[in-house]
Amino acid sequence: MTEEEDREAAADMNLFLQRRAIEQVKKSVSRTYILRDDNATDSGRVIGYYAISVGHLVPDDIPKVVSPRMTIPVFLLLRLAIDKDFQGKGYGAKLFVHVLHGLVRLAEETGIYALVLDPLNDHVRLFYEKFGLRSLPGDAARMFIRVRDVEAWISQTRH
C-alpha cells in the first residue's frame, strides 16, 4: 500500500465508525463490534472492528444439492478493518475468529447455512482463504464458508 492508500484506508475506517456504523445500528441494518487497545493512554484506541448482518442467497448462487428452489439464510461479514498501526500483529485473525464464533452461536439459534463476504482485494482474499473460505459458486467475487465447516475448524483448532 502506498502512503496515500494508507491515509485513505484510515479515513474510510474512521468515517465508517463515526457515521455509518451508528446509523446502521439505529436502523437495525447491521451491528458493529470494536476491538480497543486497553493499554492505550487515549482511553482505548480502536485497534479494529467488524460489521455484520444477515442476508440470503438465491438458488442460482448455491449448488442445487443444498437447495433446489428456496433462498438460503446467511451471515454477512460487511466489513473487517484493522488500524494500520496494528496490522500484521494478529488482530485481524482475532476479530475474524470472533466473527466465526458468533456465526456458530447464531446458527444454533436460528438456522444459518454459511458466512458470506465480499473481499476488498486479492490480499484480503488470501487472508480469508487461510480460514477455509472459498469463492461462492455462481458469484466468484464473493467468498463463503458453511457453518458446518466453521464448526469443524473450531473443534480442530480449539479457538
Question: Residues of each region from the PLM?
Answer:
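Non-catalytic substrate-recognition and accessory regions of acyl/acetyltransferase enzymes
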Residues: 1-89, 93-116, 120-159
